[in-house]
A protein has these predicted regions:
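Active-site substrate-recognition segment that forms the wall
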Residues: 1-6, 43, 135-145, 152-229
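C-terminal catalytic lobe of FAD-dependent flavoproteins
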Residues: 76, 110, 203-204
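Conserved beta-strand segments of alpha/beta enzyme cores
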Residues: 75-77, 127, 176
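Short beta-strand/turn micro-motifs at beta-sheet edges
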Residues: 39-40, 86-90, 205-208
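Helical element adjacent to the flavin cofactor pocket in flavoenzyme catalytic cores
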Residues: 60-72, 84, 91-157
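Dinucleotide-binding Rossmann-like beta1-alpha1 core, especially the glycine-rich loop
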Residues: 1-80
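Helix N-cap/beta->alpha junction signal
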Residues: 55, 110, 162-163
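Short aromatic/hydrophobic contact patches that present stacked aromatics
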Residues: 49-51, 98-100, 186
């Protein structure tokens, strides 16, 4: 966790914020394009993300973060108490201020979206191999194959996208990536009596409520306990 703490220094935060913005700023239009090709557009919502506050003192704690977003080109809209109620009548009157990120989007069914994308991948000629990756075969600096429990797959290039397990795979290729697990937890409330109209973060409560196809998903707890915990 030492490297994690060091990454929280102000100069590092600014560097990482810029890098993350460049990495993710095109994700919504890109996933919308993929979803359209996979007949999954009905599972994508592009309605924004709302963060709500219980007064100015509550908002002041986040002011630096919002300024950092602004400097990196994130467009936001500040909503007063009345504007909040006009935007979403289901919100509690305890919230007196909100900030809307208009360009954000979300999926109402992650499993359904991935399933349809996978079907399109197969329909386009993709091949699915169920095996555990053990390592790689290289020739100089060139990648020649992926060693799996089902044999070696000959490749010219590969994308390492194995979540927290990517660290050991990258290490085998000589890349030392400061990567560890961040487990997230959520609950889903089926048939809620009321729900926010878009994903909404309670800033002081430190949780996000997201309307989903299967109900209202409430998330906000994470755990740093290592890969083998």
């Amino acid at each position: 966790l030492i490297r994690f703490l060091l990454a929280g220094r102000p100069n590092k935060v600014k560097e990482q914020a810029k890098a993350l913005r460049n990495l993710i700023k095109s994700t919504v239009p890109l996933i919308k394009s993929l979803a359209e090709e996979a007949d999954a557009s009905h599972l994508i919502r592009h309605e924004g993300h709302l963060t709500v506050y219980r007064g100015e003192a509550d908002f002041a704690k986040d002011r630096g973060g919002w300024e950092l977003r602004r400097l990196n080109g994130v467009r936001t809209q500040i909503l007063s108490a009345d504007a909040l109620r006009d935007f979403d009548p289901n919100l509690s009157h305890a919230f007196t201020k909100g900030i809307l990120i208009e360009e954000n989007g979300h999926t109402i069914n992650p499993q359904g979206l991935v399933t349809l994308l996978f079907r399109r991948f197969i329909a386009n000629g993709g091949e699915f191999v169920s095996a555990r990756v053990i390592g790689f075969e290289t020739e100089g600096r060139a990648l020649k194959g992926i060693t799996t429990t089902n044999g070696v797959l000959a490749v010219d290039a590969a994308v390492v996208a194995a979540g927290a397990h990517s660290k050991s795979l990258a290490n085998s290729l000589g890349d030392d990536i400061p990567l560890d697990t961040e487990r997230g937890y959520h609950i889903v409330i089926a048939n809620p009596e009321a729900a926010p109209r878009i994903p909404t973060t309670d800033a002081s409560g430190k949780f996000i409520a997201t309307p989903m196809e299967m109900g209202l998903r409430v998330a906000g707890t994470v755990e740093f306990a290592g890969l083998t915990a």
